[in-house]
Amino acid sequence: MSKKLHIKTWGCQMNEYDSSKMADLLDASNGYTLTEEPEEADVLLLNTCSIREKAQEKVFHQLGRWKKLKANKPGLVIGVGGCVASQEGDNIRTRAPYVDIVFGPQTLHRLPTMIKQVQEGRGAQVDVAFPEIEKFDSLPEPRAEGATAFVSIMEGCSKYCSFCVVPYTRGEEVSRPLDDVLYEIAQLAQQGVREVNLLGQNVNAYRGPTFDGGICTFAELLRLVAAIDGIDRIRYTTSHPIEFTDDIIEVYKDTPEVVSFLHLPVQSGSDRILTMMKRPHTVLEYKSKIRRLRAARPDITISSDFIVGFPNETDEDFEATMKLIEEINFDMSFSFIYSPRPGTPAADLPDDVDMEVKKARLTRLQHVINNQSMQIGRAMLGSTQRILVEGPSKLDPMQLCGRTENNRVVNFEGPHTLIGGFADVEITEVRPNSLRGKFLRGENEMNLRIATAPSEILARRPDNVPDPLGVAAFTPH
């Protein structure tokens, strides 16, 4: 009888990536298979997020539910990972002593050993250290699940925005070696992946070491990934404006694989609030970067993050944010009411904006951006869009579903042989959350760029044997 694993994940795409790696790791090392039902599991893992308000209380509420399962199944192993685990450490076990394992984002690769030690009766295991990039050296080979895949290229953030917990929960910026990143993507491409999403808390700050002692910038990485045959779309998240440099903008001029969509968080349209947030850029600098980007890629759409009701935010500050939104014409946003995060500098500031004022500001901001999004959608009516076909439509299994470059969902009729590839579709209807289209052509009629076969990249990796530093030699041609 196989052992069962249940993972509950909250938070960002990095957490989703980490959870998939936990599943692969425990399958490869211990033979655990995933189950959607926690009642069936031998191991329960909660991968947490500390971004939202009352994150800790949400964790203990979930653990309380699992406590009942453990009462009926004493051998059940319960583990807590992610950013709340990194923040709280052994304090989690103080409040929930039935938790067996507490691990941080950088120590998930040690899970097989920690689970084994618990099962051997060696007591609870707590490891929330920051061993830099070690976890990537210990993970199993990547497995593709469809035409899109996420690849983590770096961890942590060194910007220390006053409201943000990431530097304290995931550590400072550490980039994966270039050849490791390219090798993972080449493996995924050989398995049929067509779109890769590069992940990092501050992804465009990537500075990956190369085999010859050099450093690969994010702009250089984008071009190298684009050269891998089969990878015809590149996304990345999340970017920081201060790291969105001219060399990255130049990539948009000559690298069509990088999609015409960018998520670039600004947080506020007020320089005064940005200073209080310790964001090292001004509104003018942000607008300048967007202007130059649109000159390089005129059809690009932009999304962003906004925090409303930051301490001491006045009506004038908020109106400055609304002015920026109107000037940039954002396609979408992740927008939140400010709430203090324990341990951050902003938590020491008086939370002096009335909650009703915060709610009203958020409602107005979201209403404007939703209207902008609908206008952008309507402008796509009658246009031909290249769709990466992901599978049958959830609305109608007889139809297909895919995404445009600017991340719009499109449903259309077409042969199921298109799944996993690209299709050109004429947009015939615009709906609030999706588009409808008419199939025009498959990728056999397209002139997709071919540069470097994945097998060539894999062959350059010398028998998968790392050097003493754990970095294999990759020589880009």
Swiss-Prot record:
SUPFAM superfamilies: Radical SAM enzymes (SSF102114)
Main localization, broad class: cytoplasm
The TRAM domain, residue ranges: 378-441
Pfam hit, one: UPF0004
Cofactor note: Binds 2 [4Fe-4S] clusters. One cluster is coordinated with 3 cysteines and an exchangeable S-adenosyl-L-methionine.
Cofactor requirements of the protein: [4Fe-4S] cluster
Cellular localization per UniProt: Cytoplasm
Similarity comment: Belongs to the methylthiotransferase family. MiaB subfamily.
UniProt cross-references to NCBIfam families, sorted A to Z: miaB-methiolase, MiaB/RimO family radical SAM methylthiotransferase
Name this polypeptide is given: tRNA-2-methylthio-N(6)-dimethylallyladenosine synthase
